């Protein structure tokens, strides 16, 4: 999916992963409703199976287009439908978002072993492919980051371009060219 710079509706994917959907369930829903009164947003949100009905009813009651799903459903399809993602920073999730060229706001799980989720997100941030919002600053920073993206898409499109460049640099064909060049130099 390639949103145009003039597109009115933005589709936001929210993914908490196996260990972290609760922070998003509790702390994002009111913000999404608030922003949806100013900007057209569709939310696709992963949550625990027990929370699907409540979350769906909340968004529907507040006139927010939504698709709510549990962890075991088709994740790739949800990514393809989205313009941007708020996610934990597990390596496989970030790799999937990267390959599908979806900029993301990474919220690393602070209890991850050796802080590996922060390191995963930092890799992409250094390449200008994502935003990082640490969990202890989530409530105070997420609104500003989301509004900056929704109201001025220039930084969003820069991140999409950076993801595309990163993905090209990491394609097998390009890696093979580098290997052949090295072999031929020797």
Describe every region a protein language model picked out.
Residues 3-85, 118-121, 133-142:
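Donor-nucleotide binding loops and adjacent catalytic segments primarily
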Residues 87, 103-114:
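Short hydrophobic beta-strand element within catalytic cores of glycosyltransferases
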Residues 29, 139-143, 172-180:
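Short, amphipathic alpha-helical "lid/cap" segments that border enzyme active or binding sites
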Residues 75, 93-97, 101-102, 106, ...:
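Short glycine/serine-rich donor-binding loops of glycosyltransferases
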Residues 131, 136-170, 185:
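Conserved donor-nucleotide binding/catalytic region of nucleotide-linked donor-dependent transferases
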Residues 64, 80-95, 102-103:
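Acidic donor-binding loop of glycosyltransferase active sites
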Residues 71, 91, 109-113, 137:
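Short, acidic/turn-prone active-site loops that include or flank metal/cofactor-
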Residues 101, 118-130:
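Acidic, glycine-centered active-site loop in nucleotide-sugar glycosyltransferases
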